Amino acid sequence: MLKILNAVFGVTGSGEFADWANHTTDLSSASTTVGDANKMGATTIGDAIQKAVGDNQDAFQLVFMHSKVATNMAGLKLLDFLKYTDANNVERPLRIGTVNGMTVIVDDGCPTTAADTSKAATYTTYVLGLGAIQYAPAPVKVPSELTRDALKGGGYDALVTRIRETMHPNGFSFTKPTSGYTASPTDAQLAATANWSIVADPKTIALAKIITNG
């Protein structure tokens, strides 16, 4: 999913889709000097989703962020981690938290750029709303079949069922590559921005991207 999100945020909207650019908020420093304004703060997520969809911001419910960003936010008491009690009755934190009423998934698969002599490291956070990712079943050539092994355990019958599921970012269209495409796209094809195009009013797309230095 993170690779798909990275791909669609690489799409450049034009004409009626030009406002797609408002769904990305980049607060990262242009140099190696990083201040509080370049990091995730108390109002960063709220400001980013308001910029993206205006009065549709109540749809947002889920945040994917890097552990570096999550650690900084927890240190500022802006992020609360959920807890569970293990078999030894010891309370332990989960890598799932809450911020601004939204569920936070901490995943180091979120895009990052390494620091170099000219710029500090950057971290990408994704914010998703209800219906941002659509799920649907895909066709299966043989959805179910019955097999029998007469020599096993006095005769053994097994019912085999198969399912295929798809997920798709709402508001975007995927174009099948002209080469290398078989029954379904590869991870690399899904991660390629060139295979995606925006087809819906950006204000109706409950996705936001935030780039910070922590």
Which residues does each PLM region occupy?
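Sequence/fold signature of self-assembling virion shell proteins
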Residues: 28-43, 75-214
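Short, well-ordered alpha-helical packing segments
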Residues: 1, 46-50, 211
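Amphipathic heptad-repeat coiled-coil/leucine-zipper-like oligomerization helices
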Residues: 33-71
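Cell-envelope/extracellular anchoring and linker segments
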Residues: 10-49
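Long, contiguous amphipathic alpha-helices that act as assembly "spine/axial" helices in icosahedral shell
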Residues: 1-22, 53-69, 104, 144, ...
